[in-house]
């Protein structure tokens, strides 16, 4: 699959080589008791991503999605999915490459991770859970702002 990324160069390449689950975990520590409680959980979603160069112009990007559902102080379930992809990327300057690996690649991986979370929650016999779409562009900008603010505190 090819994508066109914003660049002044005609030599930009972006290809998805593979998308796969790197790690998956589902825990429901308070079953079966949690099934007897009125289902009105507090859902917390944590996201992070990491990218590493694995070969010339080839990167592995791993998106980690952790979902915790709590009813009062009891954990109903905890689901963690590490959705990974191998991307062939070239022709970008350093700034464009960072944005590609921190925004574009996680955006591609998120629907796969979300579906995996939903499947695991359903297999745990909990009500359907559909994660809201994530704007990785905003998360990236916020992380840059935080790094900038942290450097000002020194």
Swiss-Prot record:
Q: Which is an annotated Pfam family here?
A: SecB
Task: Kindly list the places in or outside the cell where this protein is found, as annotated in its UniProt entry.
Answer: Cytoplasm
Gene3D superfamilies (UniProt xref): SecB-like
What are the record keywords, sorted? Chaperone, Cytoplasm, Protein transport, Translocation, Transport
Gene Ontology CC entries for this record: cytoplasm
The keyword Protein transport appears for this protein? yes
- GO molecular-function terms, A-Z: unfolded protein binding
Which domain of life, per UniProt?
Bacteria
Q: Which GO terms describe its biological process?
A: protein folding; protein tetramerization; protein transport
Which InterPro entries does the UniProt entry name for this protein?
SecB, SecB-like_sf
What is known about what this protein does? One of the proteins required for the normal export of preproteins out of the cell cytoplasm. It is a molecular chaperone that binds to a subset of precursor proteins, maintaining them in a translocation-competent state. It also specifically binds to its receptor SecA.
Name the family. Answer: Belongs to the SecB family.
Subunit structure, briefly?
Answer: Homotetramer, a dimer of dimers. One homotetramer interacts with 1 SecA dimer.
The name on file for this protein is: Protein-export protein SecB
Organism name: Blochmanniella pennsylvanica (strain BPEN)
Supply the source organism's classification: Bacteria, Pseudomonadati, Pseudomonadota, Gammaproteobacteria, Enterobacterales
């Amino acid at each position: 699959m090819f994508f066109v990324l914003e660049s002044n160069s005609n030599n930009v390449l972006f290809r998805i080589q593979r998308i796969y689950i790197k790690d998956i975990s589902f825990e429901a520590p308070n079953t079966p008791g949690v099934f007897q409680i009125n289902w009105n959980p507090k859902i917390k979603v944590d996201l992070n991503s990491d990218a590493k160069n694995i070969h010339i112009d080839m990167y592995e990007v791993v998106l980690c999605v952790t979902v915790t559902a709590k009813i009062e102080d009891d954990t109903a379930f905890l689901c963690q999915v590490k959705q990974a992809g191998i991307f062939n990327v070239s022709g970008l300057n350093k700034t464009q490459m960072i944005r590609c690996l921190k925004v574009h690649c996680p955006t591609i991986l998120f629907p796969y991770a979300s579906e995996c979370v939903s499947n695991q929650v359903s297999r745990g016999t909990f009500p359907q859970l559909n994660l809201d779409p994530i704007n990785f562009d905003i998360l990236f900008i916020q992380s840059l702002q935080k790094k900038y603010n942290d450097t000002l505190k020194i």
